[in-house]
Amino acid sequence: MEIEVEEKEGYHIVTPVGELDVYTVPLFRKVVLKLEGYRRHDLILDLTRLTFIDSSGVGSLIEIYQKVQTVEGELAYVIDNQRILKILRLVELNKILRVFPNLGRALQDVGVTGGYVDEDFFSDLT
């Protein structure tokens, strides 16, 4: 797994590339949690370049959500992979995570809309 990190409009944007599974979660967690504790607590996890996620990967998304909530930071997820969206919907994470279809939309809406969830974005997964 490769992890790209950039700063844009006051947010750290973390983009994992490849698979987020039991083997790669430790590196992903290490990078994200280090950023979360460093300078600011506002993150966008751009998951558009993920090709696979397992239960360990989903668990890491929940853990990161909880950590950012604890410090009252902002967190958004960018996901366009229908398989990953379906997994989030099956475990009802779409009800608590702020998921956006692209980075532009996330940057536009995060921090402005509070508990924003784009329900239309998930509507075709039924």
Regions found by a protein language model. Give the residues of each.
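Amphipathic alpha-helical interaction surfaces in cytosolic regulatory modules
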Residues: 20-97
